[in-house]
Amino acid sequence: MELNFEKPLSLLTLDEIDQQEGGVIQSFRTGHTSPYPDPADWLNGEEPPPGVFITSVEKVLNWSRHYSLWPVMFGLACCAIEMMCMAASRWDLARFGMDIFRASPRQADLMIVAGTLTWKMAPWLKRIYDQMPEPKWVLAMGACGTSGGLFRDSYSVVPGFNLVVPVDVYVPGCPPRPEALMRAIMDIHEKIDKTCILKR
């Protein structure tokens, strides 16, 4: 039932508006006296009708995070060039829901760290990581990010990003190809799908 006023709303008194609303509420209450049946009762062991999906809230949240990763840029060296190539039109990063790289960590949930990290830069990497909202994921790109790479023995180079921030996926290579980075993003998607959001 809808509110059908015989005269303009501005000319009605409050009592007339209350009567109309009361009628709508009463008709709604009389039509909704029993709870909706449990899906297991009306399915009777059959497949749900087209357009009906039975799932959990956790799976819906993971699905939405899976297709809306917002990466923050943290390009430190030559691997960042391959990260930029992946964002170009040839590899079409938009099909993964990642068409916009965020400049602010407060709007991102994936950090792609590409290149050689020095100890002088490490506190800033940690600070940007701490500013990202939960849940968040880190992707270490390249040999330098994985283990320090060619510069591992240098006094100023961090031998692996996992000494500064927790890393979810490593992409080997010097530099890794855009296809390898896309494979790593798909690995992060699989990790997101297995994430337990609700504590039991």
Curated annotation (Swiss-Prot):
KW Membrane (keyword) present: yes
Location of this chain's protein in the cell: Cell membrane
One Pfam family hit: Oxidored_q6
Catalytic activity annotation: a quinone + NADH + 5 H(+)(in) = a quinol + NAD(+) + 4 H(+)(out)
Membrane topology: Peripheral membrane protein
Residues that bind [4Fe-4S] cluster: 78-79, 144, 174
Cofactor: [4Fe-4S] cluster
GO BP, sorted A to Z: aerobic respiration; electron transport coupled proton transport
Primary enzyme class: translocase
Cofactor note: Binds 1 [4Fe-4S] cluster.
Enzyme Commission code(s) on record: 7.1.1.-
GO molecular function: 4 iron, 4 sulfur cluster binding; iron ion binding; NADH dehydrogenase (ubiquinone) activity; NADH:ubiquinone reductase (non-electrogenic) activity; quinone binding
Entries under InterPro entries matching the protein: NADH_UbQ_OxRdtase-like_20kDa (IPR006137), NADH_UQ_OxRdtase_20Kd_su (IPR006138)
Any GO CC annotation of this UniProt entry: plasma membrane
Similarity remark: Belongs to the complex I 20 kDa subunit family.
Role of this protein: NDH-1 shuttles electrons from NADH, via FMN and iron-sulfur (Fe-S) centers, to quinones in the respiratory chain. The immediate electron acceptor for the enzyme in this species is believed to be ubiquinone. Couples the redox reaction to proton translocation (for every two electrons transferred, four hydrogen ions are translocated across the cytoplasmic membrane), and thus conserves the redox energy in a proton gradient.
Protein name: NADH-quinone oxidoreductase subunit B
Organism annotation: Dehalococcoides mccartyi (strain ATCC BAA-2100 / JCM 16839 / KCTC 5957 / BAV1)
